[in-house]
Curated annotation (Swiss-Prot):
Lineage, uppermost ranks: Bacteria, Pseudomonadati, Pseudomonadota, Alphaproteobacteria, Hyphomicrobiales
Keywords, in A-Z order: FAD, Flavoprotein, NAD, Oxidoreductase
InterPro entries: BetA, FAD/NAD-bd_sf, GMC_OxRdtase, GMC_OxRdtase_N, GMC_OxRtase_C
Superkingdom as given in the UniProt entry: Bacteria
Gene Ontology BP terms: glycine betaine biosynthetic process from choline
Disulfide bond entries: none
Pathway(s) this gene product operates in, as recorded in its UniProt entry: Amine and polyamine biosynthesis; betaine biosynthesis via choline pathway; betaine aldehyde from choline (cytochrome c reductase route): step 1/1
Descriptive protein name: Oxygen-dependent choline dehydrogenase
Gene: betA
E.C. number(s) listed in UniProt: 1.1.99.1, 1.2.1.8
């Protein structure tokens, strides 16, 4: 079995790659995916987003090693094990990132990935239902829209931000990210619109694209060139041959794992496990970054939250409305209002992100408050803490060793303390007067730095945005894994294209920049001229040096 291009992983970037590489009928493409079908209400119904993430059928279910700065808790680290990868189990939140994020990438050695370079790819990939204005695309395969925004708590949140003196934004994915506004989601006609929906399924209708369900064991490297992938299916081990290139799009955990199993990585680590070293790249598995968040929860004194819909009977009603009519609560992820704020004067770009939810409940659907309530997921998104992904064993089926090293930088504590106090200021605005009851979490007794730190150690968790473990950079950077054209340094015919190549975490959710990475990598692979650079100038708060709002 062989093809011109073999793509490992059908997630956000892998699906985009499959679609773009196969547009030319002369190119044959094989996509390798271990996970099964995405058909079914648990994935397709937007409001059911908590279910697939908690199901072994759809999620690799990784756990970090004990995190020393978080009471030695092991933090859940889900990754999609299904057609569409993590885009099939995520929260469907659509955030491109800030212009400064991508300019930073270029400064770190990813030449050609500045904001002016990547904006045309964001436009190419999206079908924005907010219209085209020079910043947004309307002809792409990825549907992007706002939710219904019917709950009054969404409007109270945005109004509270205005009352607190913060900026408002009509389109945080357009010229102005900073401020309070309404959140966008990747849904369409009442369904999740994953990378599989947008890219992979249309590509699979072409005769030159094949999807193989299998377990990828390692990349076959002969004489310094990737020639195929060793896979396991039906109890048999075989090799799928690549006539041109192998592209790894297996996630920020599994992409470095595959490289190391194939002999590409830190030589000492590989030798310790008895793996033949093909290329010594010490950066493989290093530079792990993520977003952390906590839930700030408040009781609602009015029965307007989603709490009424939590009993099984009413969940069934909502499910039936969605199943038969594609209407009701089921058509939205319920993250319909948001904010992107700067933590202090002198901070040029937003670094605090809010997802507002009109119910008090954990992201995984557990530990719901036994009353009407509302919450925000609060995250400081530009942490300086760095972790790693290493091999547990030379056995391809052994889970990787994930060490996030969360909160290892002192600045993270300072920023998250500020997040707690800032959120109290926002929830204390007049817009919430008619809804605001007692604080559930952190709780009104949590006031001092020490009390806030104790709360954070017990309640901070991942926002599920890992990246950076196969860092893109210049060839003379010893910690870079791929060059700016996504080629693995030191191996011919091998690329990595997913969130693992991000030199620095972007500000916001990672599905959008991961898909963009697949789009742009496809042009590099095909030898196409990159899309023309944009001349749009993003909005930067003119008061950024002297004010946080």
């Amino acid at each position: 079995m062989q093809a011109d291009y073999i793509i490992i992983g059908s997630g956000s970037a892998g699906s985009a790659l499959a679609h773009r590489l196969s547009e030319d009928s002369r190119n044959s493409v094989i996509v390798l995916e271990f996970g099964g079908t995405d058909i079914g209400p648990f994935i397709q119904m937007p409001a059911a987003l908590a279910w697939p993430m908690s199901m072994n059928r759809y999620n690799w279910g990784y756990l970090s090693e004990p995190e020393p700065h978080l009471n030695n808790r092991r933090i859940t680290a889900p990754r999609g094990k299904v057609i569409g990868g993590s885009s099939s189990i995520n929260g469907m939140v659509y955030v491109r990132g800030h212009a400064e994020d991508f300019d930073r990438w270029e400064q770190l050695g990813a030449k050609g990935w500045a904001y002016a370079d990547v904006l045309p790819y964001f436009k190419r990939m999206e079908h924005s239902h907010g219209g085209e204005d020079g910043w947004r695309g309307t002809d792409g395969p990825l549907h992007v829209q706002r939710g219904p925004v019917k709950n009054p708590l969404f409007h109270a949140f945005v109004e509270a931000g205005k009352q607190a003196g913060f900026e408002m934004t009509d389109d945080y994915n357009g010229s102005k990210q900073e401020g309070f506004g309404l959140m966008e989601q990747t849904t369409w006609r009442g369904r999740r619109w994953s990378a599989a929906s947008a890219y992979l399924k249309p590509a699979l209708k072409r005769p030159n694209v094949q999807l193989i369900r299998c377990f990828a064991r390692k990349i076959v490297i002969e004489n310094g060139r990737a020639t195929g992938v060793e896979i396991e299916r039906g109890g048999r081990i075989e090799v799928v041959k690549a006539n041109r290139e192998v592209i790894v799009s297996a996630s920020s955990f599994n992409s470095p794992k595959l490289l190391m199993l194939s002999g590409i990585g830190p030589a000492a680590h590989l030798k310790d496990l008895g793996i033949d070293v093909k290329v010594d790249r010490p950066g493989v598995g290093q530079n792990l970054q993520d977003h952390m968040e906590f839930y700030f929860q408040q009781i609602s004194t009015k029965p307007v939250s989603l709490y009424s819909w939590l009993p099984w009977f009413w969940q069934g009603v909502a499910g039936a409305q969605w199943l038969f009519f594609k209407s009701g609560l089921g058509i939205s992820n319920q993250f319909e209002a948001c904010a992107f704020l700067r933590s202090a004067p002198g901070v040029k770009q937003p670094d605090i992100q809010y997802h507002f939810l009109p119910v008090a409940i954990r992201y995984d659907g557990k530990a719901a408050a036994n009353t009407h309530g509302f919450q925000v997921h609060v995250g400081y998104n530009l942490s300086k803490s760095r972790g790693s992904v290493t091999l547990r064993a030379s056995d391809p089926k052994a889970d990787p060793v994930i060490r996030f090293n969360y909160m290892s930088h002192p600045e993270d504590w300072e920023k998250f303390r500020h997040c707690v106090r800032l959120t109290r200021e926002i929830f204390g605005q007049k817009a919430f007067d008619q809804y605001r009851g007692p604080e559930i979490q952190p709780g009104e007794r949590v006031q001092t730095d020490e009390e806030i730190d104790a709360f954070l150690r017990e309640h901070l968790e991942s926002a599920y945005h890992p990246c950076g473990t196969c860092k893109m950079g210049s060839k003379d950077d010893p910690m870079a894994v791929v060059d700016p054209e996504t080629r693995v340094i030191g191996v011919d015919g091998l690329r990595v294209a997913d969130s693992s190549i991000f030199p620095h975490v972007t500000y916001g959710n990672l599905n959008a920049p991961s898909i963009m990475t697949g789009e742009k990598a496809a042009d590099h692979i095909l030898g196409k001229q990159p899309l023309a650079r944009s001349n749009q100038e993003p909005w930067i708060n003119p008061r950024w040096a002297i004010s946080d709002r």
